[in-house]
Amino acid sequence: MSRHNKGQVIVPTGGGKTMCMIHDAIEQFKSGSLKTVVVVAPRILLANQLSEEFLEFIKDVDVLHVHSGETHHTSTTNSQKIEEWHWKSKRHQLIFTTYHSLHKIQKATAMLPDTVYFDEAHNAVQKNFVEAVEHHSMYVLRNYFFTATPKHSLTPFKIGMNDTDIFGQVICNVKAPKLVRQGYILPPKVKIKKFDILEDKEDVAERDSQHLLETLDDNNINKSLICARSTKQIVRLFTDSDFALGLENRGYSWMFITAKTGGVINGKKVDRETFFNTLNSWGQDPHRRFVVAHHSILSEGINVKGLEAVLFMRKMDFIGISQSIGRVI
């Protein structure tokens, strides 16, 4: 990154992409002139997580969050207020935002970042995001695109990460087998379980419950992530079947989170901060057995400590599968 002002960093999940950003930001902040660094994430949850990780290593900076989520840091999605914050600041600046809100920084025309890190950059090719991405790629001096799963396009009518004018060349490409050999990540093991065809009037939630409990029993899994088809499937699994009771009888705790329901722990609704604090606490507890169910919130970039397996209850594309597996390797 010290040799390139723009480029793609392709590293498998768990390979240290965030530390690459943090180390580069530390080097930038050694400059005599004040620097503004923007970190872009696909989700508010990941933006908040990245903020915590950066600030473990970087002190004495001003921090702004540009998204609609909750944070104890200064936060706004108003472009004029972004400009005012920028010009009032007397220190180096870290701005954490989402692809959804990146255009708010674009419209803050009285400021220009020095460096932008695009995390989970395969999201940057989406048509509702790419205009703001292209703007920063064109006008910001340093742009870096980090992902484990680059998304390319075979047609000139659709943007892909093979558009080097926007995304630059690949400046780093680390292969997963290398990280496995060196002990940084574990090789995933795939096991397939066949579902029986439903009989007439058979309860779908009960069938799902039976198969999930059998899978946990057969594989002796202590901490598992369940990828469900929908919020409805998750809610029915825990309310219309004996799944929760079966888990409790086996010594498991349980939790789920969706955009519609928010976080739920052992049947009790909690705020997101409590949910993720509990999730990470359980993940680090060697004696705790639990399952956590979701649709997509936990897929990309979210660090969940201690997970041993992911159970797929729906079809997913290559990127979705890769990102989900990345939570446990």
Predicted regions: what they are:
Residues 45-76, 245-246:
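Conserved helix-turn-beta segment of the N-terminal RecA-like "Helicase ATP-binding" lobe
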Residues 122-185:
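Post-DEXD/H (motif II) to motif III coupling segment of the RecA-like Helicase ATP-binding lobe
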Residues 74-115, 127, 297:
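Conserved helix/coil segment N-terminal to the catalytic DExD/H
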Residues 259-329:
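Conserved RecA-like P-loop NTPase helicase motor core
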Residues 18-20, 33-56, 229-234:
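Conserved Walker A/P-loop ATP-binding site and its immediately adjacent core
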Residues 4-24:
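Walker A/P-loop
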Residues 168-235:
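Conserved interdomain linker/interface between the two RecA-like ATPase lobes of SF2 helicase motors
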Residues 231-258:
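Conserved helicase motor "Helicase C" RecA-like lobe of SF1/SF2 P-loop NTPases
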